[in-house]
């Protein structure tokens, strides 16, 4: 089994939706834990990386660099929508020093109630966006929607476990991570730009070298 660390840096405000609102104040809220610290669910990032891996395969095959196939993606990630994957498992992605930070915030919420609350903590990581639906150049009546988004600049990290020790599987995961440029909702409106990578410089370099070597070989 191979253990890797996946990192994501938010290059723009990002909407990792929980599927719920927040009372009558927010129509679409982000995912956060019991003390107000945001995170990226494992299942969400698995789906994004699976789609990114398929895109990598498609682009390489289009360039006649036939190193990976859709079957490789299925073997690594399992069938789309399945709860458990074939060869890979993800942890939720949390901020750095998550457990220590959570313990501090839990203490402050309990002992400094006048200054700290779950709301104040989640507000420190987020901001509010409002938008309306436009119809024929005019704001549509009753279309105002409010959503909470994660602030640009937050970084997340989590463990990735790959059952296969095959170098090609590790290379495809590394390439899929580097290829992933946006996550979350409202990506066509400028949200969700990210930098995603496996925190292993050697693996990333080997993956790129593997592509370049085979590209040169295919050109000869």
Q: Where do the model's predicted regions map?
A:
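Short amphipathic alpha-helix segments
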Residues: 127-137
């Amino acid at each position: 089994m191979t253990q890797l660390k996946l990192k994501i840096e938010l290059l723009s405000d990002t909407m990792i939706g929980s599927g719920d609102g927040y009372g009558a104040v927010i129509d679409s809220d982000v995912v956060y834990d019991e003390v107000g610290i945001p995170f990226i669910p494992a299942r969400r990032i698995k789906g994004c990386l699976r789609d990114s891996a398929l895109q990598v395969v498609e682009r390489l095959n289009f360039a006649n660099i036939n190193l990976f196939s859709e079957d490789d993606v299925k073997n690594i990630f399992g069938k789309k929508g399945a709860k458990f994957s074939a060869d890979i498992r993800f942890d939720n992605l949390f901020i750095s020093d998550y457990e220590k930070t959570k313990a501090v915030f839990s203490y402050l919420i309990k002992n400094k109630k006048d200054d700290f609350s779950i709301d104040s903590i989640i507000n420190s990581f987020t901001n509010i966006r409002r938008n309306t639906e436009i119809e024929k150049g005019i704001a549509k009546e009753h279309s105002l929607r409010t959503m909470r988004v994660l602030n640009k600049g937050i970084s997340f990290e989590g463990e990735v476990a790959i059952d296969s020790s095959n170098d090609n599987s590790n290379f495809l995961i590394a390439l899929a991570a580097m290829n992933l440029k946006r996550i979350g909702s409202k990506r066509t409106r400028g949200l969700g730009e990210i930098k995603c990578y496996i925190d292993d410089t050697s693996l990333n370099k080997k993956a790129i070298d593997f592509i370049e070597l085979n590209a040169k070989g295919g050109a000869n």
